[in-house]
Amino acid sequence: MTRATMRDIDEMDFNIQVWDYMNWALGDRSLGFDRRLHWMGEPVNVTTFQNAGKPVLEMLDEARTIAADNDMRVWVAVQHVTGMDVTGSLVLIPPEAWTRLSQLDTNRELDGIHFIQLAVGNGLGVVSLYQFALLMNHFQPLGPDESKEV
């Protein structure tokens, strides 16, 4: 197997891990490649990057292009962090996506976000995948609601 093929497999594996986690966290098994995540009715494009060494600007440009191709105004890039499980991956929220999320945030839920890093080059917000899942779940507990199970 070529090195490029192995990289592609690693990227796909990381993508699957991210969506498996988001499916579990939000209790929605239909999220992923063809089904989009939504927040306050707005679709959110999530692009994953397993390569922790990839330059941030390159990742953001690629994620922005993918979102634009899908006519999505809110988008984020999820970057793997070497040595961390999937929940410790970094979610990069660009200023334009943050602005749109803020416009939709009538309940001021975004006030509950604690950035790992803010203003990394022109206002880029960085949170963990766990925090991003909490935001997408309106700060409700993550995972299946066991009180509903029989």
List each model region and its residues:
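Catalytic cores of nucleic-acid endonucleases
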Residues: D20, A25, M40, N45-L101
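Domain-level recognition of nuclease-like catalytic cores that cleave nucleotide substrates
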Residues: H80-V150
